[in-house]
Each structure stands twice: as C-alpha cells, then as structure tokens.
Amino acid sequence: MSGGWLGRTAILLFVALVTVAPAGAASPGSELERLPDAEHTFTSPDGRVSVEQYLKKTAEDDHVYQFWTFDEKHQNGALLNPNEDTDRAGYPAGFRFSRNSQWLVRMQKLGAGYHTLFLYRRTGDQFSSATPKPLGDMAWDYFFSQPVSRMMHRKSRDRDSLNHKQVHLVQGMDDNYAGMGKHWPDSRYIVLTLSFDSQGEDKPKPWIDGWRCVFDTKTGQFSIPVDLADHNAKAVEFRDRRRR
C-alpha cells in the first residue's frame, strides 16, 4: 500500500518538474564566451526580449559568433543563427527592432567592405528567420531585376564578383521613418540601401552608391517609392561623372 503511494508521488513529482522546466530549453553552452559590452546587447522597445552575442572558438583556431535571444527573465533562450560559419557570422553584429517589437534586423559585417542584413520575425518571446535567405541577398535579387542593373551591363550571375558589395539599413526603423517624412503603417516597411564599387576593374563599369529600396514585411515584396526614384538616379556612379 505504502509502495503504491510512494510510486504515485514520484510520478506526480516528475510531471511537476517537467512542467516547470520543459525539456529542450536552449541556452548557450559553456564553451561560448559572452561579449560583455553594452554595445553588444540589444533590448526590444517593449522590454520583453533581449539579444546577446557569444563568441565560439573553432578547432581551426578561428571563431564564429552566435546570437541568442532571451525573455525578460533571461529564460527560454533561442539561437538566431544556427549552422552559420565564419562566412556569415565571423564578426559581431548590430541589431535593430521595429517600433512594435515584432521584427528584428541583424546588421552583419561579412568582411572588409562587405555587409548584409538578416530579418527575423517574433513569435511569443522568441525570434526566427522571416525570409528564406538573408534579406540582403533578396535585396540584390530585386536590384538585378531592375533596368538599372542592365544599364550597368552586369547580370545576375555576376553578383558574387561585385566588389565591396554592401546592404545596410537606412536609419529610421525605430521611429517608422518619421524622420524621412513617412506616415506608413506601423512597423510594416524596412528601407535598405545597396552599394558596390568598380575597384580593380580594368575598364570600370557604372556602380551604385546608396541605391535604395523598400521591403514590405506584410507582402514580402520589394518596391521603389516614387520619392526614392530621384535619389536612386543620383546613386548611379560613372567613371566619367559628366555622363550622369
């Protein structure tokens, strides 16, 4: 009789423990070193989610960075960039939250003069990838679908050879681009700027410096608003500037 009572108690205790501490709760391993500086930690506007950065040394005496999100109690960790190597995560990153705290952009240096963006969507107190490929790669796909890329005599297959290829976030995501005079729906649009140069080309072709486009988080589509068209025309650079 007493044995049955003890057995039932043990089962109930086990169930309670599983409920309190769910199996599979993620956290950085002991082999990771957290970047302690405040500039490497980012908190959402609603204060419920934070991003921390960790350094992992590899067997080849190299290192890769991992980016983790946590809730306000520093529980329920989630890794933003699983399976990334030094090609995509060889440097610390910058992060920007949308004003409604539902979107997160990772601003990632790839090397000297190379930069891209990643977009994450929030579910509960965790973020996961919002696009099938880096947002920066999608922006280049869009650029190469535009007539301006054909004017430069560059084709889609040439994108990997572009010199100093960069995609950056235009300042204003945190205030919904009010500083640009926009009155867009809250946290729906993200403004990006693209650049590359012709350094090293024997006969330099036109390049772009600060060419802009807008990503719609609701539809997943890119566009160029009318008020950015003039800006983009001036963003095209020629070796002989008189041709502009």
Language-model segments: which ranges?
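Acidic, small-residue rich beta-repeat scaffolds with periodic aromatic anchors
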Residues: 25-42, 112, 124-244
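Bacterial N-terminal signal peptides that target proteins for export
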Residues: 1-11
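Short, solvent-exposed loop/turn segments at conserved positions within beta-propeller repeat blades
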Residues: 58-64, 110-115, 204-208
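Recurrent small/Gly-Pro-centered beta-turn motifs in extracellular repeat architectures
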Residues: 54, 107-108, 193-194
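Short N-terminal edge-element motif at the start of the domain
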Residues: 37-100
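Extracellular-facing segments of soluble proteins and assemblies that are Gly/Ser/Thr-biased and enriched
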Residues: 93-129
